[in-house]
Amino acid sequence: MPAHILQEISGSYSATTTITAPPSGGQQNGGEKFEKNPHHWGADVRPEIKDDLYDPSYQDEEGPPPKLEYVWRNIVLMALLHIGALYGITLVPSCKVYTCLFAYLYYVISALGITAGAHRLWSHRTYKARLPLRLFLIIANTMAFQNDVYEWARDHRAHHKFSETHADPHNSRRGFFFSHVGWLLVRKHPAVKEKGGKLDMSDLKAEKLVMFQRRYYKPGLLLMCFILPTLVPWYCWGETFVNSLCVSTFLRYAVVLNATWLVNSAAHLYGYRPYDKNISSRENILVSMGAVGEGFHNYHHAFPYDYSASEYRWHINFTTFFIDCMALLGLAYDRKRVSKAAVLARIKRTGEESCKSG
């Protein structure tokens, strides 16, 4: 990439907009008061939401957990998908180059629909996006097929607020397999339904684009996740139908799913905890590579309101780079960032001893 473009994007990053007070009159931009300020804050002052912050007062009730209720439809469908994906791996050498490039591009866009869309924009409100970007992200999210934005955000806010309890949809204390995929193969724990149902989701209910996706999600996901990625290689450059189905669709979809799931499983079990040793989430570079920047998980749980989800800007974090590029184009704004002083103070206060300095 030309140096002058990188400089412009870097300059856009340094001009991160920061909310300095709850919005009330004054200068307006997108209906909210904010100002550009190079001195980033360390405390969460988002006016939109608070239900993604950890609630230490919630504790699991004593007694044996309820009996697991298997969802056999999900078990069968997940098994068939991964069988198709494994077969797709054997077909990659016979695929046309265009098919491999198309599948990779589809994977990246799908991943951004989760990371930049459902996660950092709609679950945590760490930045704001104008309509063209929100439209792109809602389409990309539909391509990813990991539940609609509303349901994804509700589960994720519950994961943060009730982390490592039975009210956490993918509680890592129940083991690697459960937090990775098992939670999707059984009925939700009653605590997930109870506590998740009480979360404040009014910000998403008020967003017409999110509600439109939720209303038409089934036909949308069939088109964007399965039909389109199968037909495009087959029709446009003469790829075989089986290669299109098993590589561009099954393999690509399985990779996106597992990259996201590893954030819930591996990044809660393997890695180091420089910011907070008292929580299970960890920094995992390998997860960040696959999940386009979501592997800095100890930082993210310590500072869920930081749009970068990492202390280190673009380092193994394509999602942050993407958001900064959108900011350069004027499509993303009000990106929230934690000050270096606040990060260092948190490391000193709660970080693992091996990660502290000075």
Curated annotation (Swiss-Prot):
Induction: Up-regulated in liver in the absence of dietary unsaturated fatty acids. Expression in adipose tissue seems to be constitutive. A motif (Histidine box-2) lies at residues 156-160. It is an enzyme of class 1 (oxidoreductase). Fe cation 2 binds at residues 159, 268, 297, 301. GO terms for biological process: fatty acid biosynthetic process; monounsaturated fatty acid biosynthetic process; myelination; response to fatty acid; unsaturated fatty acid biosynthetic process. It is found in: Endoplasmic reticulum membrane; Microsome membrane. Its main location: endoplasmic reticulum. Belongs to the fatty acid desaturase type 1 family. The histidine box domains are involved in binding the catalytic metal ions. This is Stearoyl-CoA desaturase 2. It comes from Rattus norvegicus (Rat). The gene is Scd2.
